[in-house]
Design a protein with these regions (language model features):
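Intrinsic, low-complexity N-terminal interaction/targeting segments
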Residues: 304-306, 311, 469, 484-485, ...
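A cross-kingdom feature marking solvent-exposed beta-strand/loop segments within repeated
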Residues: 154-173, 304-333, 477-482, 548-565
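Extended terminal and domain-junction accessory segments
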Residues: 2-82, 193-239, 314-495, 499-506, ...
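N-terminal edge beta-strand
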Residues: 98-125, 259-273, 461-493
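Aromatic/His-enriched, Gly/Pro-containing loop or helix-boundary segments
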Residues: 109-121, 152-186, 191, 215, ...
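Signal-peptide-cleavage-adjacent N-terminal segments of secreted and extracellular proteins
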Residues: 45-124, 129-132, 137, 142
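Acidic-aromatic/histidine active-site loop/patch
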Residues: 88-91, 100, 112, 220-290, ...
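Asparagine-centered strand-capping/turn motif at beta-strand->loop junctions
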Residues: 133-137, 284-288, 497-502
C-alpha cells in the first residue's frame, strides 16, 4: 500500500514539476530562429522603389502610355549632412548618393526627396504623371510649375499660385495629375523663384518614340544620364530676401547639383560618360538661381550640334558654346570622336551680369577598346568657331555669333499666323532702380504702368471670389498695384509686342500654357513710348520679321531697351501667366496674366479640387 502511495506521489511530483526553464528556453530559441529567418528574408527581398513608378524606358509609338507615380517629399534639409563624411575634402572618398555636396559648403536646401537638383523625371510622350507633393517645409506656400507643358486638358494643374490653384500650405499633400503632352527637355520647379533657387527645381524630359523623332538620324544615344541641369548657387534667398533691390552675387554654378568653390576646391564634380565613336544627345536645362545671370555652356574641344530650343526642333546649328537665359533648354548632339580622355564641361555666367561665376563637370571617355585615332580628328571641329545665343545684343552682328533671330525652326510658321492677326497687344514694361540716398536703392517694376499683385483667390478655380476692384484698369496705370489681366478671345491669332522701357538689364519672360513663335526681336537702345512702337510696328519699320520659320519657344530673353514680337494662336482656354523670370520671389510687379476665352470655355477642375478661402479677409472682424 505504502509503496503504491509512494509511487503515486512520485508520479504526481514528476507530473507537477516539468522543467519550465528548459521549455521556455526552447520556445525562445524557436521563436528567435523564426524571427531571424523572417528578418533575413525581408532583408534580402528587394523593396519596390518607394518614390517612382519608373517611366524611364525606351519609348515606342505603339505602347500604351504609362501612369507615372511620383512622390516628391519637400523638406528643409542641408548640404553636407552626416552621410557625407568628409567626401568634399581632399582624399575624402566618394560621396554617397544620400549626400548633397553642392559646392562643398554647408547651407540649407529646400529639397524634393533629399536630392539636389530635384530628381529628373523621364517619361514618354502622353504618359500620365501622378505626382504627390508631400509638403513638409514650414513657412513655404508651394506650387510646382511644369514648364513646357501646355496643360490643355488640365489647366488647373499648371502650378501658378492664385491663378490655377491655391498654394499648398505646409504639412499637406497636393496631387498633380496631367498628361505629358509636349515632347522635349523641360523643367519643373517651385513657382517661387526663391524656393527654386534654394533647390526645388529639376529637369523634366518627355521623350518620344525614336521612329517619330525627326532627328533620330543625327544621334546614336539618347540616355537619361546625359541630362544636364545647371543652377546658380549662393546665399539662400529666403522668402524675405527677394524684397531687397540689390540681389547678392551668386557664388558658383552647379552642374547636376555639383560644383566647387574656392573654399572647397575638392568637392566632387558631375561626370558624363561617353564611348568613343558614338553620337550622344545631351539635354540641357538652365534653372537659374538668385541672380539668374545668363550662362555660357561649352565642352572643351567638342562641337555642340544644337537641335532643339525649349523642346522645339530647329535647323541644327554647329557651335562651340551656347548662351542661355534662366528657364531655357537646349538639346545638342556631341560626336565623341576626340582622343579618349577627360574633357571639361564648362559653364560661366555672362561677365556683364557677374564676373567669375563658373562651374565645371567632366566628359569622360569610357575606357573601352581604343580605336585607332586619326591624327586630324582633333582638327575637324576646330574649324567651327561660332557661338549660339538666345540673348540678343550688339554681338549678333558678328558672323561668329548665331542669335535667336538667325536660327530657323524646323517647321514653318502656320499660315494663319503670317498675316491679318486678330489681335495685337502692346506691352511696355519698366523695371528701374533709383539711388534714393547714398546707401539706399529703390526699385520699381511695372507693366503698362500697373504693378502686378496676385489675387486673393485662384482665378481659374475660384474666380467668383475675386472682387472686381482687385483687377487693373484697361488703360495704362500710374503705378497702381492690381491683378493685371489681358483678355484674348478663344481661338484668336495674337501678336504680343513686349518692350523694355527701363533699360536696367535683360529681362526674361516665360509664358504658361503656350509656346510662341518669335517673329521679331531687336534692341532699341533707348526707351520708346507705346504710340511710337505701335506706329513703327504697323508701318513695318520696327523689325524685319521672320514670318517663314521663326523659332518656337516658351521662354524669351528680352534685351535691354529691346522689343520682341511673339505670335501664337490662343487655342488653350484659361488663365496663363506671363512670368517675369528675374523676379526673385513671387513677383516684382512685371508679371501679367492672359485670360484666354470666357469662364464657360474653361476646363473645370474636379469638384474636390483643393480650395483657398477659409480664412477671413483682413477687413473683417470676428467679434
Ligand atoms: C520707368 O520707371 C521709373 C521709375 O518709376 C521712371 O522714373 C521712368 O520715367 C519710367 N520710364 C518710362 C519710360 O516710363
Amino acid at each position: 500500500m505504502e509503496s503504491e502511495k509512494e509511487v503515486a506521489q512520485v508520479r504526481e511530483v514528476s507530473m507537477v514539476k516539468p522543467n519550465y526553464m528548459l521549455m521556455s528556453l526552447q520556445r525562445i530559441l524557436v521563436l528567435t530562429v523564426i524571427l531571424a529567418g523572417v528578418l533575413v528574408v525581408v532583408h534580402y527581398t528587394p523593396m519596390p522603389e518607394e518614390y517612382f513608378e519608373n517611366c524611364d524606358r525606351e519609348c515606342h509609338e505603339l505602347d500604351w502610355p504609362m501612369i507615372c507615380r511620383v512622390k516628391l517629399v519637400i523638406e528643409v534639409y542641408k548640404t553636407l549632412s552626416k552621410s557625407c563624411g568628409s567626401c568634399t575634402e581632399k582624399d575624402g572618398g566618394d560621396c554617397p548618393a544620400t549626400c548633397i555636396s553642392a559646392d562643398g559648403r554647408e547651407r540649407g536646401v529646400l529639397v524634393a526627396n533629399r536630392a539636389l537638383p530635384s530628381p529628373t523625371l523621364h517619361v514618354c510622350h502622353n504618359d500620365i504623371l501622378v505626382v504627390d507633393v508631400v509638403h513638409r517645409a514650414p513657412a513655404h506656400a508651394l506650387s510646382i510649375h511644369w514648364r513646357g507643358q501646355p496643360q490643355k486638358e488640365t489647366p488647373f494643374m499648371d502650378g501658378a499660385p492664385m491663378l490655377t490653384q491655391c498654394p499648398q500650405p505646409a504639412y499637406t499633400t497636393f496631387q498633380y495629375k496631367f498628361r505629358a503632352s509636349a515632347v522635349g527637355t523641360h523643367m519643373y520647379h517651385a513657382h517661387s523663384a526663391a524656393d527654386a533657387a534654394d533647390g526645388l527645381a529639376g529637369a523634366f524630359v518627355v521623350r518620344q518614340s525614336a521612329r517619330l523623332d525627326p532627328i533620330k538620324a543625327l544621334y546614336d544615344v539618347d540616355a537619361s544620364e546625359h541630362t544636364i541641369y545647371v543652377s546658380e548657387w549662393g546665399h539662400s534667398m529666403g522668402p524675405l530676401a527677394g524684397v531687397i533691390s540689390r540681389i547678392p552675387n551668386a557664388e558658383s554654378l552647379l552642374i547636376n547639383g555639383k560644383g566647387k568653390s574656392s573654399e572647397s576646391p575638392d568637392a566632387p564634380q558631375s561626370s558624363f560618360n561617353v564611348e568613343y565613336g558614338k553620337r550622344y544627345r545631351f539635354r540641357l536645362a538652365y534653372g537659374g538661381g538668385s541672380k539668374s545671370c545668363p550662362i555660357i555652356f561649352s565642352i572643351d574641344h567638342h562641337v555642340l550640334e544644337v537641335v532643339t530650343l525649349d523642346g522645339h526642333q530647329i535647323e541644327p546649328q554647329r557651335v562651340n558654346s551656347v548662351e542661355l537665359g534662366r528657364g531655357e533648354r537646349v538639346d545638342f548632339i556631341v560626336d565623341a570622336k576626340k582622343v579618349p580622355g577627360v574633357y571639361k564641361i564648362r559653364v560661366a555666367a555672362v561677365k556683364s551680369c557677374q564676373d567669375n561665376l563658373e562651374g565645371v563637370a567632366n566628359l569622360v571617355y569610357e575606357d573601352k577598346k581604343q580605336k585607332v585615332l586619326h591624327k586630324d580628328d582633333d582638327k575637324v571641329d576646330a574649324e567651327v568657331s561660332r557661338e549660339l545665343t538666345t540673348v540678343t545684343s550688339d554681338r549678333c552682328e558678328s558672323d561668329n555669333v548665331v542669335c535667336l533671330t538667325e536660327i530657323h525652326a524646323a517647321t514653318k510658321l502656320p499660315v494663319e499666323l503670317t498675316e491679318n492677326l486678330d489681335k495685337t497687344i502692346y506691352v511696355p514694361f519698366n523695371y528701374s532702380t533709383r539711388q534714393i540716398s547714398a546707401k539706399r536703392v529703390e526699385s520699381w517694376g511695372q507693366t503698362d504702368g500697373h504693378r502686378f499683385t496676385y489675387p486673393a483667390s485662384p482665378l481659374l478655380t475660384q474666380g467668383g471670389d475675386v472682387g472686381a476692384n482687385q483687377f487693373c484698369t484697361k488703360e495704362p496705370g500710374q503705378g497702381d498695384e492690381c491683378v493685371h489681366v489681358k483678355h484674348i478671345p478663344l481661338g484668336a491669332t495674337v501678336e504680343l509686342v513686349m518692350f523694355d522701357q527701363g533699360g536696367e538689364s535683360d529681362h526674361i519672360f516665360h509664358l504658361h500654357g503656350y509656346s510662341f513663335h518669335v517673329v521679331g526681336m531687336r534692341e532699341l537702345h533707348r526707351s520708346f513710348d507705346s504710340e511710337t512702337i505701335k506706329k513703327m510696328n504697323e508701318e513695318g519699320t520696327l523689325f524685319n520679321k521672320n514670318l517663314v520659320d521663326p523659332v518656337e519657344k516658351d521662354t524669351i530673353v528680352v534685351p535691354k531697351f529691346g522689343v520682341v514680337a511673339l505670335r501664337f494662336k490662343a487655342d488653350n482656354p484659361g488663365f496663363w501667366m506671363m512670368r517675369d523670370e528675374r523676379s526673385s520671389h513671387w513677383t516684382r510687379g512685371l508679371d501679367f496674366i492672359l485670360k484666354v476665352g470666357e469662364q464657360s470655355d474653361f476646363v473645370q477642375a474636379p469638384p474636390d479640387f483643393p480650395k483657398c478661402g477659409s480664412y477671413v479677409g483682413p477687413e473683417y472682424f470676428l467679434i
